[in-house]
Amino acid sequence: MNITLFRATKRPNSSTYQAAKYLISKLSDVGTVYEFTLPEDMPHICLGCYACINGKEDKCGGYAYLEKINRAMDDSELLIFCAPVWCFHAPGQIKSFLDHYGYRWMVHRPNFAMLHKQAVIISTAGGGGLKETPKDIKDSMDYWGMARTYVVTQAVWGGFWNNMSEKFKTSLLHKLDKTAVRIEKHAKHLTPSLKVKALYKMFERLHLQGKMLPVDDSYWKETLKK
């Protein structure tokens, strides 16, 4: 199982990053792990130029950065997002990164390979924001067509991995253990969740009926012919 990991901070004692490393250690047959730190590995902020929406994603100012990330995701069966809560929501660099993939939502031109991949969102917080932060990312995962997305959250009261209370760390590790089991269980016979199936069927019907943007309808029709 190859993995692509996204992190929002370079801090080595980051609770979300260390949690991700622990999760990976609990998975069997792990192959290549691609790591990207945001914003360093994707510094270009979406400008709303509409190039990608219009089918010209190679004209995006951040395309050179996205190419490398896209290759890693294509080669991975699992994506992991380390998303600490910042001001009750996902870090801006993660939101900015996901904005570049609006054209990959099923309403436009999804990468259908996502229907055969899984994702994990790990969020920690000093207090609030543990519902809002993973939702910021899970919305994209569901509309990308990600087969299964798991959310792991833990309040840590501002503690980092090296000074987190044993109570919080024990709770977090237990959740990660359970998530690792779920990932491997579903990987054997991976099927999309009911929500993703429903979204896929709805957009498939709309695109095949030619009711969406022409560039998107053509993409669906041509891709499904293959």
Predicted regions and their residues:
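N-terminal beta1-alpha1-beta2 submodule of the flavodoxin-like/Rossmannoid cofactor-binding fold
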Residues: 1-110, 170-226
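Glycine-rich beta-alpha junction loops
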Residues: 42, 126, 155-158, 201
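A short secondary-structure junction signal
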Residues: 92, 130-135, 163-164
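Short, glycine-/small-residue-rich phosphate/pyrophosphate-handling segment
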Residues: 110-154
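Active-site/pore-lining binding-face segments in mid-to-C-terminal subdomains
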Residues: 139-195
